[in-house]
């Protein structure tokens, strides 16, 4: 039986890495909002071009752009046996819309996993991460041995496929990072409002995990709860 899992955590908490691990174990799609944004932006779609303006400023992409992207992805056939949502919802309004959409589609949200991490540690992690140009589900980080890029022909390449690596411009911008974290930790209109919504909702099992532990330790804690 598939599992419908929602990951929460500030940028740099490792939720994307953990999502990829859970994806592999349960063979369900890892729906990462940032990757979907990048696909739309790279494809030059109307929604993608609109989202790009907000992302480059470190602002939250408005609901009228984000929600159509995410809902359309959830409705694809590969989500029927389970899915992982990472990076969505980011506000209470989005959380309510997601819950309503799931109910309409006859889908349940089984688990909500919240990875908790100090803001300063999260910032350091963000600035050290690298993106594989071939697959966003290939996590690489210059400071973590478990997912450290490998050196080839004098440069660092993806540890999984050997592809080129890149950094996101907003990952190297301290002001943009602070702005994103400010949005996440805002309990009135930010992502924490969505977290609290699910904590108070009937249905999903909410699991809080200490994100300061090693990648392997965090994975072990998550797997014990699923």
Curated annotation (Swiss-Prot):
GO biological process: AMP salvage
Subcellular location: Cytoplasm
Domain of life: Bacteria
Annotated region described as LID, given as residue ranges: 128-171
A GO molecular-function annotation: ATP binding
Chain positions recorded as AMP binding sites: 33, 38, 59-61, 87-90, 94, 168, 180
Keyword ATP-binding annotated: yes
Keyword Transferase on entry: yes
Region span, NMP: 32-61
Pathway where this protein functions: Purine metabolism; AMP biosynthesis via salvage pathway; AMP from ADP: step 1/1
Protein family according to the UniProt entry: Belongs to the adenylate kinase family.
HAMAP family reported for this sequence: Adenylate_kinase_Adk (MF_00235)
Domain notes: Consists of three domains, a large central CORE domain and two small peripheral domains, NMPbind and LID, which undergo movements during catalysis. The LID domain closes over the site of phosphoryl transfer upon ATP binding. Assembling and dissambling the active center during each catalytic cycle provides an effective means to prevent ATP hydrolysis.
Free-text function comment from the UniProt entry: Catalyzes the reversible transfer of the terminal phosphate group between ATP and AMP. Plays an important role in cellular energy homeostasis and in adenine nucleotide metabolism.
Name of the protein described by the UniProt record: Adenylate kinase
Species of provenance: Desulfotalea psychrophila (strain LSv54 / DSM 12343)
